[in-house]
């Protein structure tokens, strides 16, 4: 079978899909590891691990009260 320039065979397309999927898996693993390290660092400093929940629960208000003292 002859392919025009720029066209890929089915095997090459599968390889590209596999490479892209592998890259995505690695990126997700790195992001997850970074989040985990960040959360552990925050816990060691005595802060809640999830800053989004912290803000939703009034963490900003607690900080303001603390600053007034």
UniProtKB/Swiss-Prot annotation:
Preferentially expressed in the neural tissues. It comes from the Eukaryota. Residues 41-50 have a biased composition (Basic and acidic residues). GO terms for biological process: negative regulation of protein-containing complex assembly; protein localization; protein-containing complex assembly. Residues 39-69 are annotated as: Disordered. GO terms for molecular function: protein kinase A binding. GO terms for cellular component: cytosol. Protein kinase A (PKA)-binding protein. Binds to type II regulatory subunits of protein kinase A (PKA) and may block the A-kinase anchoring protein (AKAP)-mediated subcellular localization of PKA. The RII-alpha binding site, predicted to form an amphipathic helix, could participate in protein-protein interactions with a complementary surface on the R-subunit dimer. Binds cAMP-dependent protein kinase (PKA). Interacts specifically with RII-regulatory subunits of PKA (PRKAR2A and PRKAR2B). This is A-kinase anchor protein inhibitor 1.
